[in-house]
From Swiss-Prot:
GO terms for biological process: maturation of SSU-rRNA. This is Ribosome-binding factor A. The gene is rbfA. GO terms for molecular function: ribosomal small subunit binding. Monomer. Binds 30S ribosomal subunits, but not 50S ribosomal subunits or 70S ribosomes. Its main location: cytoplasm. Gene3D superfamilies: 3.30.300.20. Keywords: Cytoplasm, Ribosome biogenesis. Signal peptide: none annotated. Residues 123-162 are annotated as: Disordered. One of several proteins that assist in the late maturation steps of the functional core of the 30S ribosomal subunit. Associates with free 30S ribosomal subunits (but not with 30S subunits that are part of 70S ribosomes or polysomes). Required for efficient processing of 16S rRNA. May interact with the 5'-terminal helix region of 16S rRNA.
């Protein structure tokens, strides 16, 4: 087991090395739109999981996740060599590449929130013109003082004064 702070620093360093190598040194066109988003290292520093996203060539095109995964698997040996040279640890961690689902999840959540906002706006629009059915408050009646009640109270007050 190693200090968690050291593991975090190593994970950050591995992510930087892999991202730099993909951008500048590996000439595989399948990796042109790959972005490294996060890196996790196990407590024994023997395994590193590198999370990545793939963007489309333009806004309308879908990203090619399959070819990007194949390109990363092919470049895994070169990337591990770069990590070993760049980190200086005794044992170079094995690299595992995992497609990051956070952007897709965030996009899905935004769609759900937009639908909820639209439903709230529709309810507010319908409620704006609505009026309650029946009386404003059918359960309460205003209290009305009867003349009979006033006469009954007068003698009782006079007895207390005596």
């Amino acid at each position: 087991m190693v200090d968690p702070a050291r593991a975090r620093k190593l994970a950050k360093r591995i992510g930087t090395i892999v991202a730099t190598a993909i951008d500048h040194e590996i000439k595989d066109p399948r990796l042109a739109f790959v972005t490294i988003t996060d890196t996790k290292v196990t407590a024994d520093l023997h395994d590193a999981t590198v999370y990545y996203t793939v963007m489309g060539a333009d806004l309308e095109s879908e990203p090619d996740l399959v070819s990007a995964a194949a390109g990363l698997e092919k470049a895994k040996g070169v990337l591990r060599s770069k990590v070993g040279a760049g980190t200086g640890v005794r044992f170079t961690p094995t690299l595992t590449f995992v497609a990051d689902t956070v952007p897709d999840t965030a996009r899905h959540m935004e769609e759900l929130l937009a639908r909820a906002r639209a439903a709230d706006d529709e309810v507010a629009r319908v409620a704006a013109g609505a009026s309650p059915a029946g009386d404003p408050d059918p359960y309460k009646e205003p209290r009305v003082e009867d003349a009979d009640d006033a006469e009954v109270d007068e003698p009782s007050r006079s007895r207390q004064a005596d």
